[in-house]
């Protein structure tokens, strides 16, 4: 199908909560152009690289549509009181922020923290934009109206947006407009009746192949001359001219769910976005040729903190899963009560607890900034994000250390258990007094899929970079830390009264 089929939407009233089946129908064979292994994928819900990832997202929609989860995963739309995803809630009280975190945790638990860009991530960014439309109005009131209308459309139709907000790594030594070809980085190339035309590429749309909409913008600092790249626009994933060039689809290479229990189910995929003269109607343009607003959207609205509150709740959940894996592996190897291993487990638990506590501190230290909207604590958020690129590899390394060869001394695949010539050997030498060989192998394969497979290693890169390079996050902490209070202490120490004897 080559026509644009926008996801089924309602205007003016809230659609019934979307089920998983409705979500899958909406993205199936809708004309989106996804490329993997040299092939154009017509239907991501059927292709082996994407099918199970799409079903994992569908399960999240089913959870939210289940009346048993109404309070945890939804809230009443301000439009008409009907339930909508809590990720779209604009928090006004501490209880609201807590409720948003609990919703994010519920979905993160369902994916073991292994899918970062689920529909609740970019939802947080749009909630942040709608909380502070005045930032967009600086370019003209119509842009503020557009972003609020689009937010309401996402919210009231339970839609899934992904984003690509980083220019491709072509030549980082030059600004956007001085690249060898001015249409390498995604930007506007001309206006056309009723809208604008966008051309170029942007990285890296995690979950893009599964989403309804792409938000295309730029978080990298732009310079004078870069105005054409200073845009913020929403594009349906099946818009003509939009192509998603997926990285290797790990799930397609995962032979079965026993050997690759995580790869086979939770590969959210990452895609380079290519725009071949994509037309965007004015109503889906929120920022137009304005470098200041392009910058301010991240830092002068609560978008970045709402989106990353979800990201951190997801990460804390993933670390809890890692702790569980390590504990079960120690039980399997007989090291669980070995004091040096207990010390290492204590270090792991400390690091996981720091992350978890920092997520909760974002709520506790949240403040109403203006417009009656609550912002999670930026300093707390950015501090834990800044240390993530050190904490994460440290934790993975400890788990590698305590496991020895446990994740490697494994049958080559599930099929080895079916060969009578070796099945008895596997049962005898891989089992433990408490655990049948097959159960122990399943556990170790689960851990290896988390840590050592291509899927596991991509996750380590993801945790390093999903919130931007760590030097940038540290700059955020620098900008937000209360240095006045710190230097005040130094000044007080320097002006202490003389000692009695002096
Ligand atoms: C798995 C994964 C998923 C992602 N998902 C998304 C997504 O969904 N949407 C999206 O928009 N983006 C996504 N990203 C992209 C991510 O936002 C970028 O990778 C990130 O912003 C870093 O940019 P870069 O990769 O271009 O690195 P660069 O900006 O090129 O930097 C690379 C390295 O160079 C060094 N460096 C560069 N400049 C400096 C400097 N001034 N000072 C000190 N050191 C410097 C640092 O070591 C830095 O880490 C994802 C990335 C990964 C790896």
Predicted regions and their residues:
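Alpha-helix capping/hinge segments and adjacent helical runs
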Residues: 379-502
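Short, charged, amphipathic alpha-helical segments
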Residues: 339-346, 374-382
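Glycine-rich flavin
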Residues: 75-213, 218-233, 238, 243
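Generic structural signal for well-ordered, non-transmembrane alpha-helical segments
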Residues: 51, 55, 152-155, 317-320, ...
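Acidic/polar, glycine-rich intrinsically disordered N-terminal extensions of enzymes
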Residues: 1-75
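Charged/polar positions within long, soluble alpha-helices
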Residues: 166, 331, 357-364, 393-400, ...
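FAD-binding core of flavoproteins
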Residues: 168-314, 478-502
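Extended amphipathic alpha-helical segments enriched in small hydrophobics
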Residues: 310-368
């Amino acid at each position: 199908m080559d026509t644009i089929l926008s996801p089924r939407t309602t205007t003016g009233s809230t659609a019934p909560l979307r089920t998983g089946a409705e979500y899958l129908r909406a993205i199936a064979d809708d004309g989106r152009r996804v490329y993997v292994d040299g092939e154009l994928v017509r239907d991501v819900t059927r292709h082996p690289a994407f099918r199970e990832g799409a079903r994992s997202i569908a399960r999240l929609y089913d959870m939210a549509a289940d009346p048993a989860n109404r309070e945890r995963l939804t809230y009443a739309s301000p439009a008409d009181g009907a339930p909508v995803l809590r990720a779209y809630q604009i928090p006004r009280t501490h209880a609201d922020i807590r409720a948003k975190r609990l919703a994010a945790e519920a979905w993160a638990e369902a994916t073991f923290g292994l899918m970062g860009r689920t529909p609740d991530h970019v939802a947080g960014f749009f909630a942040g934009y709608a909380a502070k439309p005045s930032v967009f109005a600086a370019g003209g009131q119509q842009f503020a109206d557009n972003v609020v209308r689009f937010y309401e459309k996402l919210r009231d139709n339970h839609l899934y947006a992904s984003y690509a907000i980083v220019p491709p790594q072509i030549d980082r030594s030059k600004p956007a407009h001085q690249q060898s070809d001015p249409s390498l980085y995604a930007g506007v190339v001309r206006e056309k009746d009723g809208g604008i035309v966008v051309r170029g590429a942007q990285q890296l749309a995690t979950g893009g192949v599964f989403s309804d909409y792409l938000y295309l913008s730029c978080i990298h600092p732009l310079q004078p001359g870069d105005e054409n790249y200073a845009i913020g626009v929403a594009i349906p994933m099946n818009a003509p001219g939009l192509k998603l060039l997926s990285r290797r689809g790990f799930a397609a290479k995962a032979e079965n769910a026993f050997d690759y229990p995580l790869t086979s189910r939770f590969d959210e995929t990452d895609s380079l976005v290519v725009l071949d003269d994509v037309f965007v109607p004015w109503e889906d343009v929120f920022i137009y040729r304005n470098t200041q607003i392009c910058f301010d959207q991240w830092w002068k609205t609560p978008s970045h903190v709402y989106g990353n509150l979800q990201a951190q709740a997801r990460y804390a959940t993933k670390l809890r899963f890692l702790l569980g894996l390590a504990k079960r592996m120690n039980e399997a190897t007989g090291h669980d009560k070995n004091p040096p291993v207990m010390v290492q487990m204590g270090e792991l638990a400390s690091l996981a607890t720091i992350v978890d506590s920092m997520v909760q501190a974002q709520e506790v230290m949240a403040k109403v900034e203006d417009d009656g909207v609550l912002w999670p604590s930026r300093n707390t958020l950015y501090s834990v994000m800044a240390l993530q690129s050190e904490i994460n590899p440290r934790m993975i390394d400890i788990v590698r250390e305590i496991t020895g060869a446990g994740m490697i001394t494994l049958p080559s695949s599930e099929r080895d258990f079916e060969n009578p010539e070796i099945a008895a050997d596997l049962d005898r030498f891989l089992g433990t007094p408490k655990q049948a060989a097959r159960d122990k192998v399943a556990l170790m394969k689960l851990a290896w899929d988390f840590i050592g497979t291509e899927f596991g290693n991509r996750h380590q890169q993801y945790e390093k970079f999903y919130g931007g390079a760590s030097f940038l996050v540290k700059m955020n902490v620098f900008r937000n830390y209360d240095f006045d209070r710190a230097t005040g202490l130094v000044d007080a120490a320097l002006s202490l009264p003389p000692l009695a004897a002096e």
